């Protein structure tokens, strides 16, 4: 389908803005589409009811100790998996209900910030990666550790299961590894163009991973770094052939102030939807076909986007972003002298299709 036809079908239309205060790191739809879940900076797991037209908020889930960044669902048994910056993983049962319960938790699943979770295709295992440089597999039914992979030289930022049961990890130097669940390394993908050392600062890395529906093309998102400190860089995606490890395409998606690709989704119609974050106030929603050099949709009205989630019905889209005039350095205070915290507007769109 050509870009004009795709845009006609998938042009986002404003529906509602939900507010998460303080911010959420990401927001994801449950497989049934009844609930949108966000991982909070305040250690809460926020939920919104998408089975009701005005999208009311459901009671938050409490039990974490730090930022909740890892989110994954298993439809069977309505299990929600969450992970935080203190190294804890929780499994919640009944995520669409008013009071989900903790089925199990592992307080010290990792020694440090858990950056991502991914569910195996058969629903029996959950993979986690963290700042301690370990990747671990856990049994979804009881949280027992199935396997621990050898500690990698650098911390891993991303983890993603493939349809065939193998999985990928991406580290902060831009090296992506393809693993069997028995610990065998299948191959490596060189995404080091998404990394630079700026004095003592590591900038970039394999920030986000995505696969097309067939599992044959791997997208690695991050930035083409230009400088450290207040990071500048061009949001970039590298597309690799999974079978060979060869880089097929590089997509550069903005200016040096747009910085990072935050999230990627391969649509069944063959295009990628992407959100980015950059210098305070810079955020983009982009649609681009892998074979093209320029997006056929560029929307810049949202600031510093964190995540992008397509509803299972294909007719709605939710993007977690940052409030305008966000406080990035801690200086602004209110009339009482208190720190002004940021919040997350979650933009909900409907789609013509």
Describe the residue ranges of each PLM region.
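WD40-repeat beta-propeller superdomains and closely related acidic/aromatic-rich repeat-like regions
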Residues: 1-353
């Amino acid at each position: 389908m050509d870009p004009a036809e795709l845009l006609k079908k998938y042009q986002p239309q404003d529906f509602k803005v939900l507010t998460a205060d303080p911010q959420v790191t990401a927001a994801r739809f449950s497989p049934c589409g009844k609930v949108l879940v966000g991982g909070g900076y305040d250690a809460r797991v926020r939920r919104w009811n998408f089975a009701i037209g005005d999208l009311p908020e459901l009671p938050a889930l409490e039990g974490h100790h730090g930022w909740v960044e890892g989110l994954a669902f298993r439809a069977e048994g309505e299990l929600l998996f969450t992970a935080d910056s203190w190294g804890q993983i929780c499994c919640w049962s009944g995520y669409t209900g008013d009071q989900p319960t903790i089925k199990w938790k592992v307080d010290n699943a990792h020694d440090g910030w858990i950056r991502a979770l991914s569910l195996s295709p058969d629903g029996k295992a959950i993979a986690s990666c963290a700042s301690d440089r370990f990747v671990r597999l856990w049994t979804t039914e009881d949280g027992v550790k199935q396997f621990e992979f050898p500690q990698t030289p650098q911390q891993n930022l991303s983890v993603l299961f493939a349809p065939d049961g193998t999985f990928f990890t991406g580290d902060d130097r831009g090296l992506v590894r393809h693993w069997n669940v028995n610990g065998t390394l299948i191959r490596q993908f060189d995404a080091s163009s998404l990394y630079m050392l700026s004095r003592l600062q590591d900038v970039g890395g394999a920030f986000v991973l995505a696969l097309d529906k067939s599992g044959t093309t791997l997208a690695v998102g991050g930035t083409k770094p230009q400088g450290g400190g207040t990071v500048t860089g061009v949001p970039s995606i590298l597309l690799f052939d999974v079978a060979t490890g060869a880089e097929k395409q590089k997509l550069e998606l903005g200016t040096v102030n747009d910085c990072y690709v935050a999230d990627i989704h391969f649509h069944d119609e063959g295009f990628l939807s992407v959100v980015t974050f950059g210098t305070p106030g810079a955020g983009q929603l982009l649609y681009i076909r892998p074979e093209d050099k320029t997006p056929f949709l560029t929307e810049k009205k949202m600031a510093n986007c964190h995540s992008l989630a397509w509803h299972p019905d294909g007719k709605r889209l939710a993007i977690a972003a940052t409030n305008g005039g966000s406080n990035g350095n801690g200086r602004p205070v209110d009339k009482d002298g208190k720190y002004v915290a940021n919040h997350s507007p979650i933009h909900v769109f409907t789609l013509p299709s």
